[in-house]
């Protein structure tokens, strides 16, 4: 009996506690206070984020965003090779794909209960915290970059192809007076404008800001930017053609006013444009064939380019002096200016190519395509200028190719800078350069070529060729950007 006495007070306390608990529950029922059940938590979430007893995929995504779950940068269009670590932060698309959910899916209570462990695991692993997100993005960037062999191999290949374009100038010299040459050159200039401008809008400038076309959805806005440029170009050309026809109808073709005649200053400033566009009618001596017939022509002409004056070299020996060797001291200053500026231009091109290949092989090839489309007409124009500045055919080929080889030096610097530093600054520099070259350099050149063709015939054909070139370049860059996540190279 003595052993049972200490237990009596404890038993008495438990009895009182049970009675108090039962009384509290009875009082709660009598006063109308709701009792908490497990289903009430689920119903509360369904009513807060959904409509009725179901959730759409967008509503479920809103819940995930509120919890900072599913904010990873994974891409379901590029499946990960091998098993994925569950401690990483998945994107909402990857989580939905794991549960076989599509945009048309309706998530009921049962489906939501099956999805809840996924949310709980991501919260427990803290994989989507800001610190882990930064580390994971850095690791994925390093893993996604091409190897050194791929960077140097593809880079050297693309630069070699681009540099070989400098040797194509000699092949078109016999056709420079043909009509189809002018129109072919017009198409390539328009193609270069379209590719350079679109490459800057779709890839280089967004890449400089760290945007991803598969995730940031900027492609449509960049396309609208090009659309604004093209709309004003198209409208201006149409208005000019209509006004030209109206003026011709009222004034005819037999009289010219003093306003329509170009001044001497305008003629001198336009010579450089004519050289770049392949207009050699006023530069190539018409008696060149006399040299080949054994005659010795006498030439006393000057080539005026801006403020520079270049004598026709070796006039007592040959009017077609580029077919023979010329002393370097007799070559005009313009030739060396063109060679040096072209070398600097090619160096920056190589810099952009090298930095692009350090990010991805696809990015590098895309940038190389834009530069290739620009280099072809550009090198042809430079080749013509070198010939008419006093160089022989062999010298023009050599120095044009030498300046093109500066692209290799730029490639090396671009690869080294992109591998050890952020390539975004190089992309920003290249994007600005591409915009300037396309709009301030090549666009007036395209207008000059088209005006020469318009004076000889209808303005409709040059206008159609310009549109084809611009839209082709735009289409190439648009397709490459939109399908960049589906194209695997290397």
Curated annotation (Swiss-Prot):
<keyword id="KW-1003">Cell membrane</keyword>
<feature type="short sequence motif" description="HHHGHXHX-motif">
    <location>
        <begin position="249"/>
        <end position="256"/>
    </location>
</feature>
<keyword id="KW-0732">Signal</keyword>
<dbReference type="GO" id="GO:0071333">
    <property type="term" value="P:cellular response to glucose stimulus"/>
</dbReference>
<dbReference type="GO" id="GO:0098739">
    <property type="term" value="P:import across plasma membrane"/>
</dbReference>
<dbReference type="GO" id="GO:0005384">
    <property type="term" value="F:manganese ion transmembrane transporter activity"/>
</dbReference>
<protein>
    <recommendedName>
        <fullName>Metal cation symporter ZIP14</fullName>
    </recommendedName>
</protein>
<dbReference type="Pfam" id="PF02535">
    <property type="entry name" value="Zip"/>
</dbReference>
<dbReference type="GO" id="GO:0098662">
    <property type="term" value="P:inorganic cation transmembrane transport"/>
</dbReference>
<dbReference type="GO" id="GO:0033212">
    <property type="term" value="P:iron import into cell"/>
</dbReference>
<keyword id="KW-0862">Zinc</keyword>
<feature type="short sequence motif" description="XEXPHE-motif">
    <location>
        <begin position="374"/>
        <end position="379"/>
    </location>
</feature>
<comment type="similarity">
    <text>Belongs to the ZIP transporter (TC 2.A.5) family.</text>
</comment>
<dbReference type="GO" id="GO:0016324">
    <property type="term" value="C:apical plasma membrane"/>
</dbReference>
<dbReference type="GO" id="GO:0015296">
    <property type="term" value="F:monoatomic anion:monoatomic cation symporter activity"/>
</dbReference>
<dbReference type="GO" id="GO:0032869">
    <property type="term" value="P:cellular response to insulin stimulus"/>
</dbReference>
<keyword id="KW-0406">Ion transport</keyword>
<feature type="topological domain" description="Extracellular">
    <location>
        <begin position="417"/>
        <end position="422"/>
    </location>
</feature>
<dbReference type="GO" id="GO:0006882">
    <property type="term" value="P:intracellular zinc ion homeostasis"/>
</dbReference>
<keyword id="KW-0812">Transmembrane</keyword>
<keyword id="KW-0864">Zinc transport</keyword>
<feature type="topological domain" description="Cytoplasmic">
    <location>
        <begin position="444"/>
        <end position="459"/>
    </location>
</feature>
<keyword id="KW-0458">Lysosome</keyword>
<feature type="topological domain" description="Extracellular">
    <location>
        <begin position="206"/>
        <end position="222"/>
    </location>
</feature>
<dbReference type="GO" id="GO:0045745">
    <property type="term" value="P:positive regulation of G protein-coupled receptor signaling pathway"/>
</dbReference>
<keyword id="KW-0967">Endosome</keyword>
<feature type="topological domain" description="Cytoplasmic">
    <location>
        <begin position="244"/>
        <end position="395"/>
    </location>
</feature>
<feature type="glycosylation site" description="N-linked (GlcNAc...) asparagine">
    <location>
        <position position="85"/>
    </location>
</feature>
<keyword id="KW-0813">Transport</keyword>
<dbReference type="GO" id="GO:0071577">
    <property type="term" value="P:zinc ion transmembrane transport"/>
</dbReference>
<feature type="transmembrane region" description="Helical">
    <location>
        <begin position="396"/>
        <end position="416"/>
    </location>
</feature>
<feature type="topological domain" description="Extracellular">
    <location>
        <begin position="29"/>
        <end position="155"/>
    </location>
</feature>
<dbReference type="GO" id="GO:0031901">
    <property type="term" value="C:early endosome membrane"/>
</dbReference>
<dbReference type="GO" id="GO:0016323">
    <property type="term" value="C:basolateral plasma membrane"/>
</dbReference>
<feature type="transmembrane region" description="Helical">
    <location>
        <begin position="460"/>
        <end position="480"/>
    </location>
</feature>
<keyword id="KW-1133">Transmembrane helix</keyword>
<dbReference type="GO" id="GO:0005385">
    <property type="term" value="F:zinc ion transmembrane transporter activity"/>
</dbReference>
<dbReference type="GO" id="GO:0055071">
    <property type="term" value="P:manganese ion homeostasis"/>
</dbReference>
<dbReference type="GO" id="GO:0030003">
    <property type="term" value="P:intracellular monoatomic cation homeostasis"/>
</dbReference>
<feature type="topological domain" description="Extracellular">
    <location>
        <begin position="481"/>
        <end position="490"/>
    </location>
</feature>
<dbReference type="InterPro" id="IPR050799">
    <property type="entry name" value="ZIP_Transporter"/>
</dbReference>
<dbReference type="GO" id="GO:0071578">
    <property type="term" value="P:zinc ion import across plasma membrane"/>
</dbReference>
